[in-house]
Amino acid sequence: HPTKYRSQYKELKDWMAKYADHPRARQLYKLALRRKPARWRGPKSPYRWAIMGISGGSVKAMPKPPRKRLSSSQRRQAAQLKRRIRWHLRKGWTKAVKQTLQSTEARRLFSTVDMDWARARLGGGYFAAGRDEWAIKWAGPAAKRSGRYLPQAHWTVAMASWRMHRYSDAAKHFEAVAKRDNSPWVISAAAFWAARAHLVNRHPERITPLLEIAAGYGRTFYGMLARRMLGLVNDFRWETPDLKPATINALLKSAAGRRSLALVQIGEVRRAERELRNLSGRANSALAHGLLAVASRTNMPALAVRLDTRLFPGGGGYDGASYPAPHWTPPGGFRVDKALIFALIRQESRFNPRAKSSAGARGLMQLM
């Protein structure tokens, strides 16, 4: 420490008693535990911020597959087996995955849907390796048995069929993905590619309904393409929600809210954002909309993206908040269009300067 000051346990304990909801409370709590003398009462635990459901949009729920009755120990073993399968596929070791599927361990721990999940993943591995017949051989039966739970199995069969010029099969499986998946990005992509398969297969009467499905997700890549092909206008909402006095009053009623407003006033926006991020975890829908307005107006792009995604998981929220343009300028100014830079930052880190990937990439643009 620059002043060589060493905090005493009583100071840390008193601090935790007052500020257990502080963003740095967990670090101070760990330090207090290390400094705690024997037989002293422990410090107050840091506040656990729960994530409340504040969705203002809708995402189609996936059906829950039947589960095999397992003990807690067996569930851990099954999860470990799935991790091993994913690791083998990342390495391209398809033979190792086949051996795992044929093992007594897999038959003992995996349900039918679990086995089909592994078969579909193996099919995806073969597709990535350019072995389309093998991809269909493994993912096809999995899609037939468990496709309603595993739309990714249909996706693998569809892509492999397309590459083999089996357009009728490709269209059928793409349509199955569009019907069963719950991701707007996947649904729009599947519907668009199903339309393309019908176009190549000379079934023009089936194209427009599928493009209309894709066009219903206008914030996705394939949704935008579909809308352009149908001659539809993209109705983006570049405004941000209004900041109402009720939001400020609500923030003033909590310690975290008061701290955040004070920090914004003295220019400590990053620290204020951490306070508001914690507060958003227990905010109701009205307060969450208010926090979105605050984040959009005070240069908090990471919080704005996070809140807009939570409030509108199916899209259709405030595009000005979901695709922010923060008041950031690099030394020497921008040499390329700043919209492109911000687009890359949103994709790579969602504007979190402390983002770190498992591969070691760091920062806003996830540089290695």
Residue ranges and their predicted role:
Residues 2, 6-16, 38-58, 63, ...:
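Short coil/linker segments at helix-helix boundaries
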